[in-house]
């Protein structure tokens, strides 16, 4: 998901997506440890998506404080 798409969502929706992506990341890491993961690049994609979403949330917090 791109940053522009994330900015169109509400903060609550973003937080919900972060929660679901964290669960997915946990499952991917578990699959990696047990040797069942085929697409290892997915871990990196999920981590970057979480970071993008947290960045947008933080931008909104900073804008609200000004």
Swiss-Prot record:
The UniProt entry's GO biological process terms, in alphabetical order, are: translation
What GO terms fall under cellular component here? cytosolic large ribosomal subunit
Alphabetized UniProt keyword annotations: Ribonucleoprotein, Ribosomal protein
Q: Which InterPro entries match?
A: Ribosomal_protein_uL29, Ribosomal_uL29, Ribosomal_uL29_CS, Ribosomal_uL29_sf
**What is a GO molecular function of this protein?**
structural constituent of ribosome
Alphabetical list of CDD domains matching this protein: Ribosomal_L29_HIP
Pfam families in the record: Ribosomal_L29
In the record, the note on similarity to other proteins reads: Belongs to the universal ribosomal protein uL29 family.
The protein's name is Large ribosomal subunit protein uL29
Q: Can you name the source organism?
A: Bacillus licheniformis (strain ATCC 14580 / DSM 13 / JCM 2505 / CCUG 7422 / NBRC 12200 / NCIMB 9375 / NCTC 10341 / NRRL NRS-1264 / Gibson 46)
What gene codes for this chain? rpmC
